[in-house]
Every structure is written in C-alpha cells, then in structure tokens.
C-alpha cells in the first residue's frame, strides 16, 4: 500500500518544504496520543461517540452517560476552542454544538470534528507540518456547504489602557519577533 510522506518547513515561517524525518516517540507521550490512524478509523471513532459508546457491531464499551459527559465544558479554553471537555475541544457554530480534537507529529496533522445533534462528522488528515490551518479551512468549507452553517466570527474585545500597557513588550518565537506597544 502506498503511504503519504510527511513534510515539514525547511526554515520556520518559510515556504520551502522537505520530507519529514521519522523519529521515535518516547513512551512518555503515549498518554497524550501516540495514535496512528486513518480517516476510516477516525470516522469509526466518531460513530462510536455518536452512538453513545456502542461499536459498529453493537458492543457497548462505554456507558452513554460517560460519552455525553465528555462533551460537557470542564474548563474555559484559551484561543483554540470555546471550552474544553474531557478530551474534546468544544465549539459552537450558528448555535450548533461542535466537538473536535486534532493531533500532530513530525510532518503529519489530523483533525476530527463531530456535530452530535446533526449526526455528522468530518475527518481531515494532511501530510504537512502546517496542516492545521488547512484543516480549519476544509472543515469550515464543509460545514458551510453541507450543513449551511456559518463559521463564527471573532468577537472584538475591549481592554482598558492599563490592561493594554501591561501587554506591551517584545515577544520572541522561533519564526520571528513581535513588538507590542500600547
């Protein structure tokens, strides 16, 4: 069977890519993921979630209450979701609940998005270290085209001059430097 080859950026922020070098993941990351999967695997897992913990062949692996509890907000999320459930990023599109989670390793990215009330799921896999941006675009286009849902627009926030001044400074990342002034 042919396999996709992962790609990473040659330089941070650059447009040139190179084949990602495979590296063994230490056992310490197993709890955080370390899962190798396919689109079919992800959609099978999505159906398991939608069916309340029951497998394709009718075997109950989790109580339905447990699956539903995983979808409940546990903590406010930073900038990647509205909140975080038990293993799930929680969002809302046009008032419709959206749960999802992504994963990444050297040169590969994956994202599973489920809309429980619509009995709908989409899985997107890419062989690029920058694939997560593409995932967002593909999921947004799919939900707009198939379910007629509009992507939530970022809401502006107001900060006092004091709060803005507290954020002023120079921030350094591997791909550049950002200078904020108040």
Predicted regions, residues:
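Catalytic loop of the DD-peptidase/beta-lactamase superfamily, centered on the K-T-G motif
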Residues: 10-182
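Hydrophobic, small-residue-rich alpha-helical packing segments that form membrane-like cores
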Residues: 1-9
């Amino acid at each position: 069977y042919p396999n996709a080859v992962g790609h990473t950026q040659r330089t941070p922020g650059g447009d040139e890519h190179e084949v990602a070098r495979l590296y063994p993941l230490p056992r310490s990351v197993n709890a955080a993921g370390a899962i190798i999967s396919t689109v079919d695997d992800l959609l099978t897992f999505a159906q398991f979630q939608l069916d309340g913990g029951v497998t394709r062949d009718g075997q109950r692996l989790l109580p339905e209450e447990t699956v539903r509890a995983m979808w409940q907000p546990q903590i406010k999320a930073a900038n990647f979701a509205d909140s975080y459930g038990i293993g799930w990023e929680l969002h809302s599109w046009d008032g419709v609940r959206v749960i999802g989670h992504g994963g990444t390793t050297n040169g590969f990215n994956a994202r599973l998005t489920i809309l429980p009330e619509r009995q709908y799921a989409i899985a997107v896999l890419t062989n690029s270290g920058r694939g997560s941006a593409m995932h967002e675009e593909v999921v947004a286009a799919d939900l707009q085209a198939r379910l007629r849902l509009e992507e939530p627009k970022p809401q502006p926030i107001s900060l006092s001059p004091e709060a803005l001044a507290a954020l002023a400074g120079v921030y350094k990342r591997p791909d550049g430097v950002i200078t904020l002034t108040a």
